[in-house]
Amino acid sequence: MSEYKDTLNLPETGFPMRGNLANREPEMLKRWYKEDLYGEIRKAKKGKKSFVLHDGPPYANGDIHIGHALNKILKDIIIKSKTLSGFDAPYIPGWDCHGLPIELMVEKKVGKPGQKVTAAEFREKCREYAAGQVEGQKESFKRLGIMGEWDKPYRTMDFATEANIIRALGKIASKGHLLKGFKPVHWCTDCGSALAEAEVEYKDKVSPSIDVRFKAADEAALLSKFELTEGHEGQGDISIVIWTTTPWTLPANRAVCLRDDLEYVLIQTEGDNAERIIVAAELAKDVMDRAGIEHFHNLGFAKGADLELSQFQHPFYDFTVPAILGDHVTTDSGTGVVHTAPGHGQEDFAVGNKYNLEVANPVGSNGVYLPDTELFAGQHVFKANDAVVEVLKEKGALLHHHAYEHSYPHCWRHKTPIIFRATPQWFVSMDQAGLRAKALESIKNVEWMPEWGQSRIEGMIEGRPEWCISRQRTWGVPIALFVHKETAELHPNTLELIEKVAKLVEEKGIQAWWDVDAAELLGADADQYEKVLDTLDVWFDSGVTHFSVVDAREEYNGNSADLYLEGSDQHRGWFQSSLISSIAMKDEAPYKQVLTHGFVVDGHGRKMSKSIGNVVAPKDVTNKLGADILRLWVASTDYTGEVAVSDEILKRSADAYRRIRNTARFFLANLSGFNPETDIVPVEEMVALDRWAVGRALAAQEEIVKAYEEYNTHGVTQRLMQFCSIEMGSFYLDVIKDRQYTAKRGGNAQRSCQTALYYIVEALVRWMAPIMSFTADEIWNEMPGQRDKFVFTGEWFDGLFGLAEGEELNNEFWTEIQAVRGAVNKLLEDARKEKTIGGALQAEVTLFADDALAAKINKLEDELRFVLLTSAAKVKPLGEKTDAAQATDIEGLFVEVAAAEGEKCDRCWHHTPDVGTIEGHEKICGRCVSNVDGEGEVRKFA
């Protein structure tokens, strides 16, 4: 063999079998950034049709988690596939940089604003902290192979973006969508000010626990809603009973709240003071025990939904309140009926908003009831608790009263109990100027993927309250408005003033608003107006990025976003805040398509949790397996539902990766010595099987590109695996090894094969590029021929071709041949087990086939043996089958396996009768002699 080894076309490549991705990828990244890969893509795509995927900004705090990786990798796959489809698809990553979590982290380091540091210094520290967090996350995303404007991302704290956020507020105000209203906030009566969530501590407190009767305003109407089980209506007053530990809020009560699906019971108490009481059926016994009522029975039942809008008498004021429905009502404790004071609770406020309840706030900033508060004027709320209880007793409204110890919010400064108190807040109104209706209409013009996203966001928009956009925080974009001190009206020149403030912020950042003297902007009007010192909800910051970023960045050339892609929780979040703000500003949706992915869970479907110990960190995966494995995991999942990840699942991704890598390596190794400039074989001169293989690649490419266009990465990876493992690995590559290794070097038989391999790998590397970006780049650099520096700057390979119309050896033919080959292989395997033969090349097979099948198989002539990987193969009529012939799974086909005649050729390992008969080449067969010394064998079919 050694004397003929140099005559073989042995595979040779610098592309290693082992990916060693964890070590190799960082080196590739260095090259990408040194040679400005992203800049090269932008240059190559300049002037092409635009595709804009707008990045929803992650929060600039903490390390990235596996959900971040899933999201960013999906975006990167889509961007890269669009680039290969000929689009100019820039990617500008973003970060959400204002808000409470950053404030909390900074407070730990420098204390609260106004203590050791001024508010201005505190904001600067927040800016520094957020900038550091962005840099950390940025490096993590880059390690995943995400390409984008990393040197010029958008950050909501960039001066230009902050200025544009303020401009967005001005536009919304100018369109009539801004509204000033009231909303309950944490309020310290000792500070006389609102508290942020961070300024609230929880400690145990003893409060009065009371069950209070609200009498039915119309007993007959109320009874008609119950299904009476006793055959009579009972006797005594009818009351619905609420439970509360804040009696002082009862003057502000404006409703009783039930849950629609809870069952409520009408109870008849027995004895001298018989009455009828309504509570949740599940809690009835607890309520009766608490009230010391031993003798009672049930009169009837009704669902909460049936009792909606029933009217009840306020326990001590002369007005009625409705029964309303809310999801926050539970049966954990109480009566299943919640006292609702929209001015004194966030849930009360939210549910009250849906029913347009009055937001009554009878309490001043010092915690004292206002002078016009009937019965309790001038009393401090906590001292008034006893007074409220006494009034309830006098009115006969108190069912039960006892002391109750519970966890209660306290001021972090004064260590005293706080209250919820409605204070003026700014809202984007959903109905004042028709915003809700326009938003609902615009939803129909957006493509929602999955489709259920449409009904989900429609339901949310239909039912949502006004959007409260104001916050009493330090680190945030200011609500840069001036309001009249007496009328509370906005300044008539608000839009012009907004632009002036925006220009200041562009130059100096948000601190400019707190620094600027009102007289600088308002002149003589300054004394009549006051600055709004609230900041904007961070959802406003990110929600208006369609304007502050997409409209503003030159990379987008004035194009609006084609696609928003985030987790399914963003129907409630970013998708919604973006939609509302865009409709408010532009009367159109900010996106054409919205695609959502599910949450990442472990292999058992559980959420990621440090306590369970099932957290998979992206950094751990890239350090161990490499980013391409993580990217392949993302692409291989059906991300529309929950996405499972575990060590076992990642191992499966690594196995799939190895199969794809080995396929690519086979292509590259067998293209050794091939120059596309000089060695390409014309289509009509190619071996039939090679033409078929290129045609299969074309069919695969059409399906893969379509799957990419539909954002179906799961479909891409499935088709890619099928092509590599089945069409190539199990058939084509297996068959061509003999020809590729043993054919005359540079002859048509070898070059035809290499031409096919070259065309296919040109396509394959592009299919891989959006998903396995590092590996695709590695393959690209090992491929023969002149080419661009990077695979990512090009487009899908257009050199593939299908089989010509009328081709005799068509796709159907090769499908049948593969079936025949499979049937023969089974019998060869049996013969191996029985030791009739060693390997397939020690066998010769005789196929006894019916006329139709024989006619097809015979089209391969003497090359049938190369397809079957045997040393000899004959086809005979079915009627001549021998006793040794065995049936196969194919009707009309029997096969006889026998040991091949002749000696083994030292070069190709085939057993043929002519080995040892050729002078000068006694150890090799005639075919090999031709390939070594002659013109080379001729192959037409395989």
UniProtKB/Swiss-Prot annotation:
Enumerate the cofactors the protein uses.
Zn(2+)
Residues recorded as binding L-isoleucyl-5'-AMP, renumbered to this chain, are 566
Organism lineage reads as: Bacteria, Pseudomonadati, Pseudomonadota, Gammaproteobacteria, Vibrionales
Top enzyme class of this protein? Answer: ligase
Against Pfam families, the record matches this protein to: Anticodon_1 (PF08264), tRNA-synt_1 (PF00133), zf-FPG_IleRS (PF06827)
One GO cellular component, as annotated: cytosol
Give the binding site residues for Zn(2+): 905, 908, 925, 928
User: What is this enzyme's EC?
Assistant: 6.1.1.5
Binding-site residues, ATP: 610
Quote the gene name from the UniProt entry. ileS
Q: Which domain of life is it from?
A: Bacteria
Query: What role does this protein play?
Result: Catalyzes the attachment of isoleucine to tRNA(Ile). As IleRS can inadvertently accommodate and process structurally similar amino acids such as valine, to avoid such errors it has two additional distinct tRNA(Ile)-dependent editing activities. One activity is designated as 'pretransfer' editing and involves the hydrolysis of activated Val-AMP. The other activity is designated 'posttransfer' editing and involves deacylation of mischarged Val-tRNA(Ile).
**Motif 'KMSKS' region in this chain: where?**
607-611
Please state what the annotation says regarding this protein's domains.
Answer: IleRS has two distinct active sites: one for aminoacylation and one for editing. The misactivated valine is translocated from the active site to the editing site, which sterically excludes the correctly activated isoleucine. The single editing site contains two valyl binding pockets, one specific for each substrate (Val-AMP or Val-tRNA(Ile)).
What quaternary structure, including any partners, is listed in this protein's UniProt entry? Answer: Monomer.
* Entry's localization field: Cytoplasm
Q: Which InterPro entries match?
A: aa-tRNA-synth_I_CS (IPR001412), aa-tRNA-synth_Ia (IPR002300), Anticodon_Ile_BEm (IPR033708), Ile-tRNA-ligase (IPR002301), Ile-tRNA-ligase_type1 (IPR023585), Ile-tRNA_ligase (IPR050081), M/V/L/I-tRNA-synth_anticd-bd (IPR013155), Rossmann-like_a/b/a_fold (IPR014729)
Q: Which reaction does it catalyse?
A: tRNA(Ile) + L-isoleucine + ATP = L-isoleucyl-tRNA(Ile) + AMP + diphosphate
Keyword annotations for this protein? Aminoacyl-tRNA synthetase, ATP-binding, Cytoplasm, Ligase, Metal-binding, Nucleotide-binding, Protein biosynthesis, Zinc
Protease as a keyword?
A: no
Which residue numbers does the motif 'HIGH' region cover?
Answer: 58-68
Q: What is this protein called?
A: Isoleucine--tRNA ligase
User: In which family does this protein belong, per the annotation?
Assistant: Belongs to the class-I aminoacyl-tRNA synthetase family. IleS type 1 subfamily.
Q: List GO molecular-function terms, semicolon-separated.
A: aminoacyl-tRNA deacylase activity; ATP binding; isoleucine-tRNA ligase activity; tRNA binding; zinc ion binding
Q: How is the cofactor bound?
A: Binds 1 zinc ion per subunit.
